[in-house]
Amino acid sequence: SDFSLEAHMNSLFRSVTVMAVMIAALPALAEGTRRDLPMHKDLRTKFEAGIKKFNDNFEGAFAAEFIDLTDGQRVMINQDVVMATASTIKVSILVELFRQAEQKPGLLKQQRPFKSNEATGRGGMGKLLSADSAVSVEDIAKIMINLSENTATNLMIDEVGMENVNKNNVAMGLKTMKLRRKMLDTETQAAGGDNSSSTADGATLMYKIATCDLPVSKASCARIREIMEIPQPEHPAKDPIPANVPVAFKWGGLEGVSNGWGIVNLPDRPYIFIINTSYGPRDPSATVRGASQLAFDYYSRLARSTEYGSRVPAAVMAKARADKAASK
């Protein structure tokens, strides 16, 4: 296997951690929104410092990336380190399913037996459904994402093919995102075959979903996001965000690992967050929750704000931005 989390971490933490901030030229964003205002720069500097503090104080390994979908600015730390994905890898499986569904009309409505097994612990939905139950392919995918159910995930891997998921990841430019094993296959995991990705690739995938830049139709892209926005169980990466703000979300957790990936539809300031931890303590929730809270507070301050810091209704601000972009 080409995956060595420990080697990546040792290399990373032999050097000084650097906080990287990029003003990205993202084609989907209006030119008129990219001006870096002095007070915005000061707020971002404080946000960067807060994220760096979470990294410095965390006992294990921490990585994060945040993308402002209004002006394209990114705040990143340790974003190129390859880490265990846990269940966040399931987002790439969902994308590959919809890619194949466009080539196979009716696939999503087809029924499949839903059977748990020893490998997946006979838990989750397997305890609720009878042995001869059948579920539609799309519903299995929703169970995989929204309940993070391992039987559903393994059924989806069988459905679309592990190699096809990886080929599609490469085609999307996700060089480090690799599906190497089924869920709860600890023997493959121990042998170095864990599912893995850099935080940067996680951010790229979520950005592609947010902007509908996927190898699927706009309708399929919208459906992928709708599935990810179905309310999910509590998670420290999602909990700081008010319930009335839609979040396309996927969490992942293993012993030592706690991850949260999301697209937050904050009015007038939508943003993406990728928060990954590894080699973590028994309960990394405080760090994950704190980083997410810091991000939500930062983007909330920018939402609906004029360049002088006062706030106006979101619809008024949207019109002002559109008018400014049109005048360029």
Identify the function of each model-found stretch.
Residues 17-25:
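Bacterial N-terminal signal peptides
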Residues 117-154, 162:
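Conserved catalytic neighborhood of penicillin-recognizing serine enzymes
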Residues 69-70, 108-125, 160-161, 226-227, ...:
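Acidic helix-start/capping segments at beta-turn-to-alpha-helix junctions
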Residues 32-54, 159-161, 205-235, 244-246, ...:
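Structured C-terminal helix/loop/strand segments within mature extracytoplasmic catalytic/sensor domains
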Residues 7-17:
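Bacterial N-terminal signal peptides that target proteins for export
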Residues 61, 133, 154-211:
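Mid-domain, small-residue-enriched loop/turn segments at the edges of structured enzyme/sensor domains
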Residues 72, 83-112, 273:
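Active-site SXXK
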